[in-house]
Swiss-Prot record:
Gene: 45
Residues covered by region (Disordered): 1-59, 71-289
Lineage: Viruses, Duplodnaviria, Heunggongvirae, Peploviricota, Herviviricetes
Protein name: Uncharacterized gene 45 protein
Bias (Basic and acidic residues) ranges: 50-59, 179-189
Bias (Low complexity) ranges: 156-175, 231-242
Organism: Equine herpesvirus 2 (strain 86/87) (EHV-2)
Superkingdom in the source lineage: Viruses
Biased composition (Acidic residues): 99-115
Cysteine disulfide partners in this protein: none
Compositional bias annotation for Basic residues: 1-12
Amino acid sequence: MSMFLKKQKKTKGGSSEEKRRGRTGSPPRMTSDPGAPRLKRATYFQFPKDGIKETMRKTKDAGDLDDVFFEDCTQCNPPSHVPVFSKPKPRTRAGGAADDSDSESSEDGGEDDEETLHSQDTPPGGSSSDSDDDDQKLPFTATGGIKMPGYMSRISDSSSSSSSSSDSESSSSSDSESDGDRSTPEPDILRQVTSSLARGVSPPRAKPPPAKGEVPVISLLSSEESDSEGEPSPLRAAAAAASQKRKHTSSSSDNDPKHTKVIYISSGESEDEGEGAGAGEGEPLGPEDQVLVVMSQESCEHYMATTPPVAGNPPYNWPWL
């Protein structure tokens, strides 16, 4: 074992005493750990401050990142293709004397482009009559918005027509928004059903009132289906007459005045005449009430054809619900 240690010492070149004295070229160890590296000096990473300063200076001179270095656009002049939105300046008078505010605002560099645009088309001594011609020549308004040629005229025409139509609607006392949206008169069959429900009149073959959890069914059947079902009740006879009238004289129904009465279909109404009279006449539908309206294909097509497509899905915009 001692021979092995001596051989190792010889291979390393000298004894430990010579190493401690520093006679060899290798520096002494900083720690007692034999695997530790030999440190000549502390090599810390130095951040290249000079290189970064040079890069920032070059970027500022190039003007690519002006929005980063100048966040408030008051220290830099924007390029000509960038639109500048500012308050409209008062026009210079015929004598050439401008307001004090105009002279103060002309100091800002961001508003020079708009002044040049105004000065290209209008002389500095323009009067109030020349301002209309100036507005027609320029494609944008004084506040910076883009003009559309026939936009305001279309708005004024539509507003005048809508105001006249709203006046006519207000003269006829309309109590519900759904009736205001409907442009066709109320169908006869619906009038018959709602009037019979409001009076509490029930057909002779009256079914028992629905249970607590059931949904009441209001049947609006056409003439063909009512004839095929057997003996017609007064309500079905009225429905058949209304459908026949709608078939033959559909053009005359358009000339009738618009009926603007409120339609209430209450789920709490009972089929008995005694209870039906006091079943909340004129009572609106609550959120917990449900009404199922059963219609034939002909009636459905008629209602869908005469109902204007208001906002939403047209098949679900029932005008009476």
